Amino acid sequence: MNNVLITAEQRIVLLANGRASLENPDFDPAPVVKLFTPDGGATWLLTEIDPDDHDHAFGLCDLGLGEPEIGWVSLNELASLRGGLDRKSVV
């Protein structure tokens, strides 16, 4: 599962941010987690997890192509990424 990427403490904060975001559309939390590919240019700055679907996190997603965007990402998909050296790609 995606616990490999996010600690229990980070998950608590991300879920709390997700609940606060549902209650207040103007809620604008700071990033809680930075994930990146060590052998590539991709970076994810995550601010919240959907309290109804713990696999989806929200934040800034930059695949290293010069066009970062804000949106949702699957934590399970991030955990399954492999880099060019065939090792776990996101840390």
Report each predicted region and the residues it spans.
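Acidic, aromatic-enriched beta-alpha/helix-loop junctions
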Residues: L46-G83
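Short acidic/glycine-enriched loop/turn segments that link adjacent beta-strands
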Residues: G40-G41, D53
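N-terminal domain-onset segments
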Residues: M1-G40
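Conserved small/polar residues in nucleotide/adenosyl-binding loops
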Residues: V90-V91
